[in-house]
Curated annotation (Swiss-Prot):
UniProt region (G4), positions on chain: 136-139
Molecular function terms from GO: GTP binding; GTPase activity; translation elongation factor activity
Gene (name only): tuf
Organism: Bacillus cytotoxicus (strain DSM 22905 / CIP 110041 / 391-98 / NVH 391-98)
Name the record gives this protein: Elongation factor Tu
GO CC field: cytosol
Record lineage: Bacteria, Bacillati, Bacillota, Bacilli, Bacillales
Length: 395
């Protein structure tokens, strides 16, 4: 049978399975593809195919991730599943697989476990905006009251981390039974996907977000002015737009884009993903530098102090061989530049070992354009020793 081409006309959403080891994340992933395959919306993938996830390297960090794709009547999904707990931690912090929503898998037979909590916390920290719950292995629990108890526990845990625990959809099912073709349990997979379709909103397209472009290079063209080059990260910029120059300097400056050039051709506008040169009115060559960003006025501010969730590379990944302590001063690489920063560790954490993940407070020596969810690397003498994501802004 010829493989059907995926319809690209449907809105695209990135999701993933999260939860404690052996609660059934990979089995559920296999079950979703198998059940949807019957409606022609996927290629059925077995447990073994998903579990044998290839290793990938993202910013020098080794991560095993399985990617599957499938579609429902209304949407096209890219779904990530990680074999090991460490892979989830790395994946979520580096944003190797950005998630618009997550399916939290909890075994009804065991209830929430330590990694259930940790994955919910990570989702909160790295900005996974929506979670749908799949209570798995319900075929093994005869007691209806016990199921309700586990559901309440999961809802409370989600609320504890500022997710709307009372409103989140919870579907009770059995991934294994669905995978084996039991119609009663297959219906639960269909129900789960209907909840995911309804509850997880279609993400805003990159081009609909406010304009932002990290400055990679600056040069002046005699008689015309100063050009900043870079790749548009999000949004759209048109000739005549007013933009702000943000970061590294005390004051945020504003200027008008008088020209947009791409591949030596003049354009009226550029959008997310385009590599451009932007001609800026009245900006001297020394008023703008690599590491700053051009952005829609008021859309992003420069900050020097924030909380971040960080994964510290292991020795095997080329990271440090020794732990670091509070007041450690590495470089923080944001978008196109390194800025020195000082680290404070949480109460009761003496040191951080290579291979750990930790929430830390960072104070940079110069402010940069950051928001919740901005990704960065931690570098020491030019080599990457950590990867992080801004969890919250302090000042």
């Amino acid at each position: 049978m010829a493989k059907e081409k995926f319809e690209r006309s449907k809105p695209h959403v990135n999701i993933g399975t999260i939860g404690h080891v052996d609660h059934g994340k990979t089995t559920l992933t296999a079950a979703i593809t198998t059940v949807l395959a019957k409606a022609g919306g996927a290629e059925a993938r077995g447990y073994d195919q998903i579990d044998a996830a290839p290793e990938e390297r993202e910013r020098g960090i080794t991560i095993s991730t399985a990617h599957v794709e499938y579609e429902t009547e209304t949407r096209h999904y890219a779904h990530v599943d990680c074999p090991g707990h460490a892979d989830y931690v790395k994946n979520m912090i580096t944003g190797a697989a950005q998630m618009d929503g997550g399916i939290l898998v909890v075994s009804a037979a065991d209830g929430p476990m330590p990694q259930t909590r940790e994955h919910i916390l990570l989702s909160r920290q790295v900005g996974v905006p929506y979670i749908v719950v799949f209570l798995n292995k319900c075929d093994m629990v005869d007691d209806e009251e016990l199921l309700e108890l586990v559901e309440m526990e999961v809802r409370d845990l989600l609320s504890e981390y500022e997710f709307p625990g009372d409103d989140i959809p919870v579907v009770k099912g059995s991934a294994l039974k669905a995978l084996e073709g039991d119609a009663e349990w297959e219906a639960k997979i269909v129900e789960l996907m209907a909840e995911v379709d309804a509850y997880i909103p279609t993400p805003e397209r990159e081009t609909d977000k406010p304009f932002l472009m990290p400055v990679e290079d600056v040069f002046s063209i005699t008689g015309r002015g100063t050009v900043a080059t870079g790749r548009v990260e999000r949004g759209v910029v048109k000739v005549g737009d007013v933009v702000e120059i943000i970061g590294l300097a005390e004051e945020t400056a504003s200027t008008t884009v008088t020209g947009v050039e791409m591949f030596r051709k003049l354009l009226d506008q550029a959008e997310a993903g385009d590599n451009i040169g932007a001609l800026l009115r009245g900006v001297a060559r020394e008023d703008i530098q690599r590491g700053q960003v051009l952005a829609k006025p008021g859309s992003v501010k420069a900050h020097a102090k924030f909380k971040a969730e960080v994964y510290v590379l292991s020795k095997e990944e080329g990271g440090r061989h020794t732990p670091f302590f509070a007041n450690y001063r590495p470089q923080f690489y944001f978008r196109t530049t390194d800025v020195t920063g000082i680290i404070q560790l949480p109460e009761g954490t003496e040191m951080v070992m290579p291979g750990d993940n930790v929430e830390m407070t960072v104070e940079l020596i110069a402010p940069v354009a950051v928001e919740e969810g901005t990704k960065f690397s931690i570098r020491e003498g030019g080599r990457t020793v950590g990867a992080g994501v801004v969890a919250s802004i302090i000042e």
